[in-house]
UniProtKB/Swiss-Prot annotation:
Assembly notes: Interacts with cytoplasmic tails of a variety of G-protein coupled receptors such as muscarinic acetylcholine receptor M1/CHRM1 and calcitonin receptor/CALCR.
One of the GO BP terms on file: hematopoietic stem cell homeostasis
Biased composition (Basic and acidic residues): 13-31, 231-247
Tree of life domain: Eukaryota
Tissue: Strongly expressed in the brain and the cochlea. Also in lung and muscle tissues. Localized in multiple structures of the cochlea, detected in the spiral ganglion, stria vascularis, spiral ligament, inner and outer hair cells.
Keywords: Phosphoprotein
Name of the featured protein: G-protein coupled receptor-associated sorting protein 2
Pfam families linked to this entry: Arm_2
Modified residues (Phosphoserine): 275, 277
Compositionally skewed regions (Polar residues) per UniProt: 59-73
Source organism per UniProt: Mus musculus (Mouse)
SUPFAM superfamilies, sorted: ARM repeat
This protein's record includes keyword Phosphoprotein: yes
């Protein structure tokens, strides 16, 4: 940055290059507001040959610790006056001050120009008391190469500073300055204030010792950006020209003592440089170094000084180098546009208005003091949407944005540690707070008051989206058996005129797998998402029974049947029960309707077989397939069928003789036997009947009933083809296991027919079946079951038949061997 412009009157003279820093503070001693007209005198240019590092260490960063003579932990409160503290600095100790600024505490990176103050060179500082009094001291010519702004401490009637030259390496940690009460001046130091101004305002600055600063000009410039922020941050949130530098009771100033012009690219835009020393990179006060963040942010106590003057230097209108933009920001991404907007070229000169305009703005500032105090107490440490006009704490231009002054002063882009420092003296008098509150502040979200709670209540409590199983588990309310479980269905039969169904009781042992559809989660009255409650929402045409989990639901069966109908028959291959029974979609829907109308358990068993809920023998499945499941149910229930019955079932119904002493199944079996024998030999209807009877004889329940028709079936062994013989032999093989029918089965006529099957022309399967039949009867004879059942039973026919059977078996074996090896047979 080149030399600073010095303005005399209302005309700026850029040729002036002062090396002084002027900082004034108006000390409020009475209730009446005091407005001091700043006096401006031209400054003598600096004659330093080398450009020293002139960034001043802001007391808000260095935090000079004021060892008060009052009791530790207490705070002096004086109505209408700033608290006085007889301060004595301890040599060798790191200075430490309170973070509260007088009148309107501003965050460390904010500077707000106040109307009525006239810029003076590069070193600009306006003192503003907590009640709106502004004063600018009359600066005498003092060749102070570097100075540190110091909070106003009234000791007696005047304050004289005494500097000690220390090593710059330990300047920040061990810089000592003793403040003595008196009116005599120190030798070698010219007074900064006039005689009548010094008594009212006190000393705001003290000369900072410079040991090796002139020897490290270049390194100081390179390290100047290592300020209170980390190195990745933009060193300027918003470019401040020298005319706009303005703070309320904690202003900064920076001296440019270098006479030669040297452009600065990355060192010019400062936010708040802590120090201009060459050891800035290793500064223990540097932000995010990890060891001094508490010293930088937290207010130590209420009894300390309430202001931290800060350093602000900025001549350029905007960044001179684009490298400044890439650095990260303190603020949210949404604030980038506000912070980095380019300023108009005329904007730096907007503050150079005539004195009439500035006087008017001074009056407005005094009138807005009550508003300012409220803004100071509240602060603006919220998110971007709260204080976007403040531009993240950066000071706005006086003439362009006069309304944002209060928000900018009270604003802060830091976290909640700085909120206690925004209260200033007005906050001390309005709201006394605990020491912990001043130290820690509020760690909560916006609109929370600064408080210290060891167990704070969070703003938002995360709740589980899913219900805890233990909450729903209630063993006392759970059903003990399936009989206690009732499900009420809503089938579509009501629209067809059928009576309303009663609640269906699931039988014991049945597995429940009814479809459940969870309703979408609804938002409660408070906008919080409620747990989704699964409610039973069964479709109207759904089959009102529970299925085993291994089987498909009604909707899945519907989709499967529709897919089968849309596919080509030759391309469709499926082994499910519906495909095996050849149930169509229309027939399946009729079956569901019948299930709602009929309560007969036997009909329900047939329907369960068709649905895949019950396993059945191959005979039963074949019978249902050949007759049709709907036609079969309608025939059994004597319901008028809505379809044309199959010829097989129709003939069975009409031709069946009345059997009043037999149940429905026995009557049906008798009808099947008579229908099978009555059909022509080897006809499809006869084969269907034989297949049905073969499956019916798997169990012994109907053996005696079917044995009455054995003579007719034996006749088929002599007249039928190989396929017919196979089905007849399979049925007789099932009967051979039962001793009750063995006498009829192994009669003399039957044995001769069986022996006649042992020939070379008979198929191997049929011969194997006959052999198994003789083995079964042999086992029955050996067990003695035949003699127990029938005393008149004779074994002679069986013995002769067995001998003949053995001879035929040997001859058959020889014939089979000869067919396999013709040469050996010859």
């Amino acid at each position: 940055m080149t030399g600073a412009e010095v303005e005399t009157g209302s005309q700026a003279k850029p040729d002036k290059k002062p090396q002084e820093e002027v900082a004034g503070g108006a000390e409020r001693e009475s209730e009446a507001p005091l407005v001091v007209r700043p006096k401006v005198r031209p400054q003598a240019p600096a004659t330093s040959g080398a450009r020293p590092k002139t960034e001043t260490k802001s007391s808000s960063r260095a935090r000079p610790k004021t060892e008060t003579q009052s009791v530790s932990g207490t705070r002096h409160r004086m109505s209408g006056a700033r608290p006085r503290s007889e301060a004595q600095l301890m040599s060798g100790a790191r200075p430490k001050t309170d973070a509260r600024a007088v009148g309107g505490a501003r965050p460390k990176t904010e500077a707000k120009p106040i109307p009525g103050a006239r810029p003076k060179g590069d070193a600009q500082a306006w003192a503003h008391s907590e009640f709106g009094a502004e004063a600018m001291p009359r600066a005498e010519r003092a060749h102070l190469s570097n100075s540190v702004t110091w909070p106003p401490v009234n000791v007696g009637s005047a304050t004289v500073t005494k500097s000690k030259s220390l090593s710059m390496n330990t300047e920040l940690a061990s810089m000592g300055s003793e403040i003595f009460s008196g009116t005599q001046g120190q030798p070698g130091i010219e007074p900064w204030f006039g005689p009548r101004e010094e008594a009212n305002m006190g000393s705001w600055c003290y000369p900072r010792p410079r040991a090796r600063e002139e020897t490290s000009n270049e390194s100081a410039d390179e390290n100047s950006t290592m300020s209170s922020f980390w190195t990745r941050e933009e060193t300027s949130i918003r470019s401040w020209p020298r005319e706009e530098v303005n703070t309320r009771s904690r202003h900064r100033a920076k001296h440019q003592t270098n006479a030669r012009s040297k452009p600065r690219s990355k060192q010019d835009p400062y936010i708040d440089s802590l120090s201009g020393s060459e050891d800035e990179a290793s500064n223990p006060f540097c932000f995010w170094a990890g060891e001094n963040t508490n010293d930088m942010f937290r207010a130590r106590g209420r009894d300390e000084a309430n202001a931290r003057p800060k350093i602000r230097t900025k001549r350029e209108d905007y960044f001179e180098d684009e490298d400044e933009i890439y650095k990260e920001s303190w603020l949210l991404p949404g604030e980038e546009g506000n912070r980095f907007r380019r300023r108009d070229k005329e904007e730096p000169n907007k503050t150079l208005k005539n004195e009439n305009e500035k006087d008017v703005k001074n009056d407005e500032t005094v009138e807005q003091e009550s508003r300012l105090e409220e803004e100071v107490i509240i602060g603006s440490w919220f998110w971007a949407e709260q204080e976007t006009n403040v531009e993240a704490g950066a000071s706005a231009i006086c003439d362009a944005e006069p309304g944002a002054e209060e928000g900018a002063i009270g604003g802060s882009l830091f976290w909640t540690e700085e909120k206690p420092s925004l209260g200033a003296v007005a906050r001390d008098e309005v709201r006394p707070e605990s020491e912990e509150e001043a130290l820690f502040g509020s760690w909560f979200w916006d609109r929370d008051e600064a408080c210290f709670d060891p167990n704070p209540t969070p703003v938002y409590t995360a709740k589980s989206r899913y219900r805890d199983p233990e909450e729903d588990l209630n063993l006392a309310s759970r059903p003990k058996t399936w009989d206690e479980v009732t499900i009420e269905f809503k089938p579509p039969c009501h629209g067809l005129g059928f009576p309303s169904p009663r609640p269906f009781i699931i039988p014991e042992g049945a597995s429940g797998n009814s479809e459940e559809k969870a309703k979408n989660a609804e938002l409660g009255a408070e906008g919080e998402e409620q747990d989704s409650v699964a409610q039973r929402d069964l479709p109207e045409p759904e089959f009102p029974f529970q299925y085993d989990p291994s089987y498909r639901s009604v909707q899945e069966i519907r989709e499967h049947l529709k897919a089968r109908e849309s596919a080509q028959p030759e391309n469709w291959s499926c082994t499910c029960i519906q495909c095996e029974l050849r149930i169509s979609s229309a027939e399946f829907e009729e079956l569901l309707l019948l299930m709602d109308r009929i309560r007969d358990p036997f009909i329900h068993e047939i329907a369960k077989i068709a649905m895949g809920m019950r396993t059945a023998s191959q005979f039963t499945r074949d019978f249902i397939r050949d007759s049709g499941v709907v036609s079969l149910i309608e025939a059994l229930m004597n319901y008028p069928s809505s379809r044309v019955r199959t010829n097989f079932l129709e003939n069975m119904v009409h031709m069946a003789p009345p059997y009043p002493n037999l149940n429905m199944i026995e009557t049906f079996i008798c009808q099947v036997c008579e229908e099978t024998l009555s059909h022509s030999v080897n006809s499809p209807e006869q084969l269907t009947g034989m297949r049905m009877l073969r499956h019916l004889t798997i169990t012994t329940d109907y053996h005696v009933l079917i044995a009455n028709y054995v003579s007719g079936f034996l006749a088929l062994l002599t007249t039928g083809d190989a396929r017919t013989k196979f089905h007849v032999l399979k049925m007789l093989l099932n009967l051979s296991d039962n001793p009750m029918v063995a006498k009829k089965l192994f009669s003399a006529k039957a044995l001769s027919i069986f022996v006649g099957l042992f020939n070379i022309e008979e198929t191997n399967d049929n011969i194997q079946i006959v052999i198994k039949m003789f083995q079964n009867i042999s086992n029955i004879v050996k067990s003695g079951a035949m003699s127990l059942l029938d005393d008149d039973f004779s074994l002679e026919p069986l013995v002769s038949a067995f001998h003949e059977f053995e001879e035929l078996a040997k001859q058959l074996q020889i014939q089979i061997d000869n067919q396999n090896d013709p040469e050996e047979g010859q």
